[in-house]
Amino acid sequence: MIRVICDNETFELPTGSTAADFASKIKNSHYFAGVVINDQIKDLSTTLSEGDVLKFVTFTDPEGREIFLHTSAHMLAQAVLRLWPQAIPTIGPVIDLGFYYDFANLSISEDDFPAIENMVEQIAKERFEISKKTFNDKQEALQEFASNPFKVELIQEFPEDENITCYSQGEFMDLCRGPHLPSTAPVKAFKLLRTSAAYWRGDPSRESLVRIYGVSFPTTKELKEHLHQLEEAKKRDHRVLGTKLDLFSQQECSAGMPFFHPRGMIIWDALIGYWKRLHQLAGYKEILTPQLVNRSLWEVSGHWSNYKENMYTLKIDEEDYAIKPMNCPGCMLYYKTRLHSYKEFPLRIAEIGHVHRYEISGALSGLMRVRAFHQDDAHVFLTPEQVEEETLNILNLVSELYSTFGLEYHLELSTRPEKATIGSDELWDLATAALERALINSNTPFVINPGDGAFYGPKIDIHVKDAIQRTWQCGTIQLDMFLPERFELEYTNAQGEKSTPIMLHRALFGSIERFLGILIEHFKGRFPLWLSPEHVRLITVADRHQPRAQELATAWQQLGFVVTVDDSNESVSKKIRNAQNMQVNYMVTLGDREIEENTLAVRTRDNRVLNNMTIDTFINTILEEKNSLSLTPLL
């Protein structure tokens, strides 16, 4: 007999029992997709050992969802091979909103999707058992996949001493690390989304492939809800709205580096202005460090040896330089410009730095995935005893910032990875416990990701939920025990001795470009007044009203409003439609009556008409709306 632990209870099982054997004794076990054993995700067919700690996962768990989607990708490949036997499967990973599979020697269109979907449905009905096979010898694996040059290439890259695994279901077998569902039966709702061209390993010099994207769910109801969400997401696509609202553009000559237009810069400046005010009140000092730095800095930071392939490098006077991919090393140099005492800790240093990181062209997407972006970093230098309190301060700052935009969020605490190389066990335990206590005291729900921290410290990730319930990883709070040591940072402690500070590295927006993309989609382009690129548009009824419109525009601009005048020859109704299409918050129509009575005819973005409004009432109300950072109109 062996003893295992599940849900904090100990169970005795016969020696040789699998996770599936144990699961069969649990109610609703047919929903289980896999099992986490000692913090490692595994197949349900895994044999259990004495002392194992188990957690069964379903589709609603991130691990379970990944298993479900990964199996669905294999079912897609199996269906394609049944319909087009000459196709050559390459890889089929899980992605954020589903999965894809790449094929060589295949030509299809979306007209073929119904046939593939029907075949996947048939494979699910056949209820194939999914089994794992391990090759202890690389040559055996090469022989098994000899007819597929893509699999052969992958197998050849495996270390000689590493086991190679594959999974089979019916007549289909694929090279894969797993884990997978026990059978094909649970995949009851399957939908193909689109197809595109791709290159093997993302390299344009390699073989051209056909990529098929799909998504799957345990029930038709969940699939319908997801497809509805995708339709809503299309309406909110920041790339479409960014063009329609004249906020930004993409140019072929500078892929992944967006061009912000004047209207987009108004939103940008409002975001940055809010961020600066928030941080000044929280005791942060702002710096600005160079973008182009000598190789020597990146060698000290470790980027040159570990991150060089993601950096843009060049030579100046025969010396190697790199455009910074991160702000952290520059802040380390700033810290070293003078001596420090524990009395000035926590020392909060902030920087909105322009960073550049290489991304393959196929991964670029609007403002969400770029090569150049601004990151709102801050580095807080402190003593070990201050970690908990300062983390709580940062969490309170997170709460204030995201609530300002009406964004819900959840937090994830990632703990020490198995191969952590920096810091003692004691320091890791103290640091992790401090972050966890701060999370508890913040009264914000959080989950723990065991072993998912960086090698230099535990971290808290901030996941934002938008208006259509999608989640985005934005900010992070990272405890860094690495860089202060690498850069030989020091401070004088209370005993008058030299010590190395602990550093909290945190970003709230994360990438400001990405956060702006999220906001465009969250608000559907209908920004609250304080963020809006155009607060008021004055609409003249006739040419004779233009001087008064310009007079009001000038006066209101001096109060800090973004005001434009439409004195074109279009009809008033057309001018109003144009303003509404550009999501202007307030439209003010000026005709003879308004000028004679010194009043305003105000129309809101939601088409509410407010006639005979006094100028003072209008201005005072929208001033309050703007200055209070209100998310809803006050008129």
UniProtKB/Swiss-Prot annotation:
It comes from the Bacteria. One of its GO terms (biological process) is threonyl-tRNA aminoacylation. Pfam families: HGTP_anticodon (PF03129), TGS (PF02824), tRNA-synt_2b (PF00587), tRNA_SAD (PF07973). Its cofactor is Zn(2+). The keyword Ribonucleoprotein does not apply. GO terms for cellular component: cytoplasm. Zn(2+) binds at residues 328, 379, 505. Binds 1 zinc ion per subunit. Residues 1-58 form the TGS domain. Residues 237-528 are annotated as: Catalytic. The keyword Nucleotidyltransferase does not apply. One of its GO terms (molecular function) is threonine-tRNA ligase activity. InterPro entries: aa-tRNA-synt_IIb, aa-tRNA-synth_II, aa-tRNA-synth_II/BPL/LPL, Anticodon-bd, Anticodon-bd_dom_sf, Beta-grasp_dom_sf, TGS, TGS-like. Its main location: cytoplasm. It is found in: Cytoplasm. It catalyses: tRNA(Thr) + L-threonine + ATP = L-threonyl-tRNA(Thr) + AMP + diphosphate + H(+). Belongs to the class-II aminoacyl-tRNA synthetase family. NCBIfam families: thrS (TIGR00418). Homodimer. Catalyzes the attachment of threonine to tRNA(Thr) in a two-step reaction: L-threonine is first activated by ATP to form Thr-AMP and then transferred to the acceptor end of tRNA(Thr). Also edits incorrectly charged L-seryl-tRNA(Thr). This is Threonine--tRNA ligase. It comes from Chlamydia felis (strain Fe/C-56).
